[in-house]
Structures are given as structure tokens and as C-alpha cells.
A protein has these predicted regions:
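Active-site cofactor/cluster-binding pocket
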Residues: 1-158
């Protein structure tokens, strides 16, 4: 394990599963043996307020907040959040956005899980770890649908 800190910024609107997705990434990174820090910012979701979550992991992480210009990844559950978060992105940052997915996924309640699948193309955590976390986070009938969406997004089918 090198000294690199990986910075993932999640952004969207209240109710879109931003916190659920960032919680799952936090747990996955922890189970992979990383030191993990997480922060959340909750807007007024009843009025379409922004919600964001910073997840930072590496050998040793001291602050939960991603400094401006250091986000490696942006997981934006709404397209308009990309401009809002731009100052946090490092040059060459990977942006995962709804338009990366077919309409039936982009407009579903499983978009956050699909985005984790797409993110895992870069993180390369074991799929079985993600499937276990999905099963722990959702009821059985919902979990299997989420696993299918995760798998498709991770394997470039969605």
C-alpha cells in the first residue's frame, strides 16, 4: 500500500442515495484495509438542496474533507452538480454522470449503485465485497436487482 490518498466526491440532490453510496464506499475501503475518512453536507432536500459526501482513503488519512483541486473522482447523480463541484477536481479527474448510463438506469432508484459499479472499474475492489455490502444494505428482492445493475455498470454493459 503506497502513501497515495484516493479522494471520491459524491454529489446530488437529497433522496438520490448519495449518502448510501458514500457509506458503502467507506465500508468497502475499510474492509480493503485502508484508513478511511468521510464527511457529509446535507442541503434542504425538501427544496431540492444539494447533498455531497467526501470519501478519502489511503494508508493514513488525516482530514475527511477533500481539499480544492484534489478529487480523483466525482460521482455526480445530477448533471448540474458537476459545475458546482468543479473547483474540487484535480486535472484529469474521472467524472461519473447520469448521461453515462442508459435512460432506464439513469432515471431509476438504482443509479447510485450503478455509479458505484462504474467507479469500481477504476478502484478495482473485489466484486464479492460489493455484493456482500449490497446484500447487507437492501432487502433481498431489491439487493439482487442492485447487484445486477452494479455488475452491468462495472462490466461496461450499462
Amino acid at each position: 500500500m503506497d502513501d497515495k490518498i484516493t479522494n471520491v466526491l459524491f454529489a446530488g440532490i437529497g433522496g438520490q442515495g448519495i449518502i448510501k453510496a458514500s457509506d458503502m464506499l467507506t465500508e468497502a475501503a475499510f474492509r480493503m484495509g485502508y484508513d478511511v475518512k468521510k464527511s457529509e453536507l446535507h442541503g434542504m432536500s425538501q427544496r431540492g438542496g444539494s447533498v455531497s459526501s467526501d470519501v478519502r482513503f489511503g494508508k493514513k488519512v488525516f482530514s475527511p474533507m477533500i481539499p480544492a483541486g484534489e478529487a480523483d473522482y466525482l460521482v455526480a447523480v445530477t448533471e448540474d452538480q458537476i459545475a458546482v463541484c468543479e473547483e474540487y477536481l484535480k486535472p484529469g479527474a474521472i467524472i461519473i454522470r447520469p448521461s453515462d448510463f442508459p435512460e432506464e438506469v439513469a432515471n431509476s432508484k438504482m443509479l447510485n449503485i450503478a455509479m458505484l459499479g462504474r467507479l469500481n472499474r477504476y478502484l478495482k475492489f473485489p466484486e464479492d465485497l460489493w455484493f456482500e455490502l449490497i446484500r447487507q444494505s437492501f432487502k433481498a428482492e431489491i439487493a439482487e436487482s442492485n447487484i445486477a445493475v452494479f455488475r452491468a455498470a462495472a462490466n461496461k454493459e450499462a
